[in-house]
């Protein structure tokens, strides 16, 4: 087996792809990852990094393109790290995701079950209802956009195809306010400067907009002028919030939220229910796909109206309340206090008297239900990205529900 070195030129055949858009080739038994290459392609590459377990190569040219390769419709791709697969047609992207799920089930989970086809979205542009623009200074001026892949270097963008159009005017208004009043962007190297992120939530059904400015200070300077600039940027802004975040690190939001205009929340409709959304509240970013997901969850739960349902990681109660309409009792459990406050409010404003919410972890929930002699018939889990922890799995097993969704 020949040894690969940084700078080596190669021609490789791409066999598969990772979920983040890197093609996978094999050279003398060694796995080589090629960002931007698609399965089935023959490519000219140069070795960029040789690690202990993997080799990474730079794509120089595509010698034999895949039938699924398309011209990217975004001028910032692939420099911007927001999207990974804009060079692949959408149907093939769905197939890739299905293959990835199947691989996780088989390779990691040791399961022989087959993954169902991925349900694609009818709308693939302008669908996100949340935007997070990191802010930096470049060449003496503030810019906002998205981090380049695996870096903290901001790629300035004028328009992002997957964000709502209102985000462009809001971003522009904040940057103009910063320039006019000489308000510096945050520098994570020196921990100086002010503005860290421009954070936007958009109600897909209501049209309401929440703007949150995250800054490295306890008191935001020129906040009245900021409010005026944002309100002049266009209609729809319902509330403007300031979140101080003076900690080092890459956490976006702070722990405090001070309304500068409005009450700090917006309202949106999902699956025919009304939800109050604060800046830190979890809410699926693709509204249309979230409705399809939740409707499927209710269908899989097979509710007849006589069941007690437990929703772990319930967030603001979106899934819990969807389930409550079809169950005898729905219990939501979430460890974030603000989310539970929103969930209780959402239950009340939707008249859901059979929904109950608790701020605790899953292990505590299992003990509480046991003490109350309550056994859930159905448990629904929609965990954060890191997945369901081992102790939560043990708690679910101990509760012995008839169905887990």
Q: What are the language-model segments listed below?
A:
Residues 60-72, 78-185, 205, 220:
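Extended interfacial segments that mediate partner engagement and assembly in macromolecular machines
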């Amino acid at each position: 087996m020949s040894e690969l070195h940084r700078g080596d030129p190669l021609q490789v055949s791409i066999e598969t792809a990772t979920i983040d858009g890197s093609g996978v080739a094999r050279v003398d038994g060694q796995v080589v990852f090629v960002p931007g290459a698609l399965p089935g392609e023959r490519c000219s590459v140069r070795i960029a990094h040789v690690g202990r377990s993997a080799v990474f190569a730079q794509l120089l040219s595509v010698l034999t393109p895949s039938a699924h390769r398309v011209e990217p419709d975004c001028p910032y791709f692939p420099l911007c790290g927001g999207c990974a697969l804009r060079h692949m047609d959408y149907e093939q992207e769905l197939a890739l995701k299905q293959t990835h799920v199947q691989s996780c089930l088989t390779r990691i989970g040791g399961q022989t079950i087959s993954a169902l086809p991925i349900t694609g979205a009818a709308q693939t542009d302008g669908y996100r209802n949340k935007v997070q623009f990191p802010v930096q200074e470049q060449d003496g001026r503030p810019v906002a956009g998205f981090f380049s892949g695996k870096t903290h270097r901001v790629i300035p963008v004028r328009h992002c195809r997957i964000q709502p159009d209102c985000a462009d005017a809001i971003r522009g208004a904040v940057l103009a306010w910063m320039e006019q009043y000489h308000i510096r962007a945050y520098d994570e190297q020196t921990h100086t400067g002010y503005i860290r992120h421009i954070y936007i939530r958009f109600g897909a059904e209501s049209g309401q907009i929440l703007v949150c400015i995250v800054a490295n200070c306890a008191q935001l300077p020129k906040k009245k002028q900021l409010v005026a600039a944002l309100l002049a940027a266009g209609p729809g802004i319902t509330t403007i919030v300031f979140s101080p975040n003076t900690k080092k690190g890459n956490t976006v939001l702070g722990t405090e939220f001070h309304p500068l205009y409005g009450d700090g929340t917006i309202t949106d409709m999902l699956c025919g229910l009304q939800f109050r959304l604060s800046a830190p509240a979890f809410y699926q970013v693709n509204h249309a796909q979230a409705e399809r997901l939740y409707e499927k969850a209710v269908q899989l739960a097979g509710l007849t109206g006589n069941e007690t349902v437990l929703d772990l990681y319930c967030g603001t109660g979106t899934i819990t309340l969807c389930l409550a309409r079809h169950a005898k009792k729905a219990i939501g459990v979430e460890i974030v206090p603000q989310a539970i406050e929103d969930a209780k409010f959402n239950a009340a404003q939707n008249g859901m008297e059979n929904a109950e919410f608790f701020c605790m972890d899953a292990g505590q929930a299992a003990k509480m239900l046991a003490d109350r002699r309550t056994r859930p018939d159905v448990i629904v889990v929609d965990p954060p990205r890191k997945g369901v922890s081992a102790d939560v799995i043990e708690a679910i097993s101990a509760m012995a529900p008839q169905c887990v969704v």
